[in-house]
Amino acid sequence: MTTDPTIFDESLGKELHQPLSVARMLFSGGMTVLAFLLTAAAVVPLFAILFEILRQGFPALMKLQEVRLFGVPVPLPEVLVSLPAPEGVQDRANGFANAIVGTLMMVGVACLFSVPFGVMTGIFLAEIGKNSAIANVIRFFTVILSSVPSIVVGVFAYGVIVLTKITIPIPLLNFKIQTGGFSALAGGFALGVIMLPIIALSTEEALKLVPTHHRLASAALGGGRFQTIFRIVVTSAIPGITTGVLLAVSRAAGETAPLIFTALSSQFWPQGLFTPTPSLSVLIYGYASSPFKNQNQLAWTASVVLIGLVVLSSILSRQVTRKRLKRR
């Protein structure tokens, strides 16, 4: 016994073209309005913060100063090429170029420490250990570390690096690593501890998103376990891993509390990895509460630059991901 399919087509068509009841239309409209209001509640504060920071800090970027680059005079914002002026001094160039350099130095040190260990930890959790007891323990402590307040990390780095005097010679490079005292090395270590769990967990999630048939295809072609992991799985997950690393960099660049305990600050150019080093976040913290207007203004402008660096890293991560996906 067969059923005429046109009967179902006609009934389905009538159901689809039947007008909605007033109650359903009101409910649908109400939920749409509610969704819009909730979205606005999340977005409006963000735009309000950005607007106020740009309004207060952007005008100072319009004040230019000529700097010679490779013998050619180039006009650049004064705040990006000058050192901070002394307190209360109004008639000289006022900037935070040293804080930008110090921030990049410490984030670079943090990346040297956290990226290799974080990526390898993520690979172990996703591909090697998986659900083993060791992997579960590592995953548990990694999640806990990601939720530890940054000021606690700063106190830890203060005790381990700042208060401990150790000299580690590196004969091949004719170089010595020295701990003890406030330094960019201590600040980079603290930021690296903050970045480590973010990179590890994001790497694990990125590797889990790689389809299983990629692994099976590699095994079918004779690929070994580690060949499959590093040449197939990790390569496919590079966009996600890169995004996680850049998100961790964004988080580290905005940290203040750990750097107060480790790198402290300075009014001068960074003198190396083993001396007190300025940073944008600490400069903002100190100058925002200053009684001098020129330092208050510098705090607003430094906030604009710091947000710009974070936004730039986010855009960079998206571009890297898109290019990688297009190649595939």
What are these regions (language model features)?
Residues 1-39, 317-328:
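Transmembrane alpha-helical segments of polytopic membrane transport and secretion proteins
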Residues 14-33, 51-110, 131, 177, ...:
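Periplasmic/extracellular loop-to-transmembrane helix junction in inner-membrane transport proteins
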Residues 101, 105-113, 117, 121, ...:
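Hydrophobic alpha-helical transmembrane segments of multipass integral membrane proteins
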Residues 110-142, 163, 317-323:
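Transmembrane-helix boundary motif in ABC transporter permease subunits
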Residues 143-191:
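Generic hydrophobic transmembrane alpha-helix motif, especially the helices
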Residues 202-207, 211, 219, 225-261:
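Transmembrane alpha-helices
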